[in-house]
């Protein structure tokens, strides 16, 4: 399958500070791909280089197809109406308006409101609609559900999955690890300007090692314990609580979340 995006030996520096140190990765056509990294890791710079919003020093970037970019914030005029913005973007892209897409995102339901009157969720939907004008092949989403309530998040997740089912390639930047784990086929983690990991969430788990988290609720409070030997640790904890005559109200065990594995990789620095 032809890659939607290829990044080869990408380097970018600001003065003497090397932000991207020759990173390589590919994004397959039709996948949802997340680019992650703590502040200062180079994630935003990498995305802006791929989107064509920032110049890079050396390397090569290939994007196969048209791009659509949904930014986290927008500089739309406060008093512009959603359909006015849609018509402007359609004119700039020299394309027809896709009424079915607008209906799916609920844009016509808010067409009489001014931008300043829209809720966070409505603005997110409008930003996505503007990114989809011109029927792009590759769509960049920057924190698409930030500030949304649960219903709004689930609705937008459904829209993203629908785009994938249409063969679109989605590049997602998010600080919400649960969202990434739910939506994405693969993830890349940037650390100090290098790609520390690129693969699936389960491959990340294998990379950092299987960790278990024991959550114990007692009358004194809740505590979580991390271990790679669940049986011995659980027996030891229960014996200790029994000796202290502490009554256990509830015990839960899980294998850890993507966020916990992400933190572990950052702690290791690799």
Where are these regions (language model features)?
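Catalytic Walker B motif of ABC-type/P-loop ATPase nucleotide-binding domains
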Residues: 139-143
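Conserved ABC ATPase "signature" region
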Residues: 87, 96-111
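Short, charged/small-residue-rich alpha-helical element at the C-terminal edge
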Residues: 203-270
């Amino acid at each position: 399958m032809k890659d939607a995006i290829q990044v080869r030996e990408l380097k970018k520096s600001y003065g003497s500070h090397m932000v991207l140190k020759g990173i390589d990765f590919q994004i397959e056509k039709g996948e949802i791909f997340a680019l992650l990294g703590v502040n200062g890791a180079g994630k935003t710079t990498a995305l802006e280089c791929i989107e064509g919003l920032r110049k890079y020093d050396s390397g090569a970037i290939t994007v196969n197809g048209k791009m659509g970019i949904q930014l986290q914030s927008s500089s739309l005029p406060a008093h512009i109406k959603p359909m006015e913005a849609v018509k402007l973007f359609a004119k700039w892209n020299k394309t027809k308006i896709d009424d079915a897409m607008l209906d799916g995102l609920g844009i016509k339901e808010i067409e009489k409101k001014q931008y300043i009157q829209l809720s966070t969720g409505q603005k997110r939907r409008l930003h996505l609609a503007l990114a989809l004008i011109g029927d792009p092949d590759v769509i960049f989403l920057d924190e698409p559900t930030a500030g949304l309530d649960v219903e709004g998040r689930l609705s937008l997740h459904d829209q993203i999955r629908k785009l994938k089912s249409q063969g679109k390639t989605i590049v997602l930047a998010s600080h919400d690890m649960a969202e990434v784990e739910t939506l994405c086929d693969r993830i890349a983690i940037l650390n100090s300007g290098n790609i520390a990991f690129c693969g699936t969430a389960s491959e990340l788990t294998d990379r950092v090692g299987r960790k278990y988290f024991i959550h114990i609720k007692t009358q004194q409070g809740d505590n979580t314990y991390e271990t790679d030997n669940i049986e011995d640790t659980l027996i030891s904890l229960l014996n200790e609580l029994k000796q202290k005559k502490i009554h256990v109200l509830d015990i839960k065990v899980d294998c850890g979340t993507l966020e916990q594995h992400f933190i572990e990789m950052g702690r290791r620095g690799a």
